[in-house]
Amino acid sequence: AERANARLAASGVPGRIHLRKNNRDAEGNGFGCHENYLVRRRGDFWNDARTLVPHLVTRQILVGAGHIAGDGDTRPAGNGLRDLRDYVFSQRADQMWDAVSSATTRARPLINTRDEPHADVEHYRRMHVIVGDSNIAQGSTLLKVAAMDRRLDYLEHGGDLSDLALADPMRAIRDTCHDMTGGVLLERSDGRTITPLEMQAEHLGRLRDHVAQGIEVTALHEAALELWERGLQALRLQQPEIVDTELD
């Protein structure tokens, strides 16, 4: 953009070019940031997909790109929907309407379950996540991808996250998005409540325990786990300067 603006100025052309990276246009139409993870073909793919939902609902407190909600943004309010105009965690959260589905344009799910592995179909499936924001900070992308990679590895090693299931993921993703403290109470399927901060901390703790059992991890994975912890600390203490050069 800077080079283009320099050429415009040198040519005497008025105006200025701005480059933006987002997941929605001025009319509120959305477009996804797609993440694709290669997973082993197992009989419990659907269970794994549903197990990932609480993380995908709440990870926006760390890797959301931020958004000023305006016209076209709605969330449940009583028996209807109300317009919102405030700063929120994620551009995508208010546009998602299902947890897992193969109907990506009609239902806008967190996870697209169509069986399109783009690999050896006998051995692999694709975990296709479409709820994420388009990030600019490299740290955000690292944390977003590495956290999912570790979580999928945890599940493939027999880990269980089903006890953290949410009663209403679509309400939870909106409530999480619009509470910038990370402290809103989300109802779990077992009737108990948990905050997005607590949900992310619980996931991080289980993955750290998993790694401590001797699971091989790369330096990037270690960096992501450390950034994850500092990101939660920054939100818990309301001190964004702890990670303000690393996360969007």
List each model region and its residues.
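Active-site acidic/histidine clusters and adjacent loop/turn architecture
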Residues: 1-20, 186-230
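Short, flexible coil/linker elements and helix-boundary hinge sites characteristic
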Residues: 12, 158, 214, 236-239
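Loop-rich catalytic cores of soluble enzymes, especially ATP-dependent carboxylate-amine ligases
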Residues: 15-26, 31-193
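Low-complexity, intrinsically disordered regions enriched in charged/polar residues
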Residues: 46-50, 83, 105, 201, ...
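Substrate-recognition/cap regions that form aromatic- and gly/pro-loop-enriched pockets
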Residues: 226-248
